């Protein structure tokens, strides 16, 4: 796809991930970083942060584990949780824009795992202190999207 877009001067929007900020940690993060490097100059790389939804989520994702009461521990991490509907509106904002480059797609407001678990009735779980390979905090820089008129509307704690 990148080759076609480059050869035909077609703008391409593609999914990246906040994991690129520590791209050396795992194969997924490496693959997203490679995509960003290989992307054509007139493309838009969207670094999605912690995407969630009440309706659809992988069973191994924290939000789903809290929702289904299958989580066995909590961490002290803070995550930038962004609802899938806000992802859709961010993409809809980017499509007609002339923006090119890579940008963060998140709320810019990290929420602690403990606060989320407490809201969902799971705050009683033990805290796991040792979590190698996990970032303490993820937080999107939303300035570029906000300058295009986009703002997230769904708060995970509401």
Name each region found by the language model.
Residues 1, 39, 65, 144-146:
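Structural element of the ATP-grasp superfamily
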Residues 1-30, 44:
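Conserved Rossmann-fold NAD(P)-dependent oxidoreductase catalytic core, especially the SDR/UDP-sugar
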Residues 17-20, 50-56, 110:
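Active-site proximal helix/loop that lines the substrate pocket
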Residues 27-29, 33, 37-88, 92, ...:
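NAD(P)-dependent short-chain dehydrogenase/reductase
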Residues 45, 81, 110, 139-140:
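Short aromatic/basic micro-patch
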Residues 71-72, 94-105:
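Core catalytic loop region at the nicotinamide-binding pocket of NAD(P)H-dependent oxidoreductases
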Residues 74-76, 102-103, 111-118, 122-142:
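C-terminal "lid/loop" region of Rossmann-like NAD(P)-dependent oxidoreductases
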Residues 120, 155-158:
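Amphipathic terminal alpha-helices
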């Amino acid at each position: 796809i990148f080759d076609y877009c480059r050869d035909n001067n077609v703008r391409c929007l593609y999914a990246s991930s906040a994991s690129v900020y520590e791209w050396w940690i795992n194969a997924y993060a490496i693959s997203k970083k490679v995509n960003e490097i290989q992307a054509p100059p007139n493309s838009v790389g969207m670094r999605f942060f912690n995407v969630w939804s009440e309706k659809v989520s992988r069973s191994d994702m924290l939000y789903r584990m809290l929702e289904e009461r299958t989580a066995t521990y909590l961490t002290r991490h803070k995550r930038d949780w962004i609802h899938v509907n806000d992802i859709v509106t961010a993409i809809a904002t980017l499509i007609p824009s002339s923006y090119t480059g890579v940008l963060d797609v998140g709320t810019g407001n990290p929420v602690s795992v403990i606060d989320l678990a407490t809201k969902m009735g799971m705050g009683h779980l033990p805290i796991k202190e040792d979590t190698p390979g996990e970032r303490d905090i993820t937080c999107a820089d939303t300035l570029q999207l906000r300058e295009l008129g986009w703002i997230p509307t769904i708060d995970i704690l509401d």
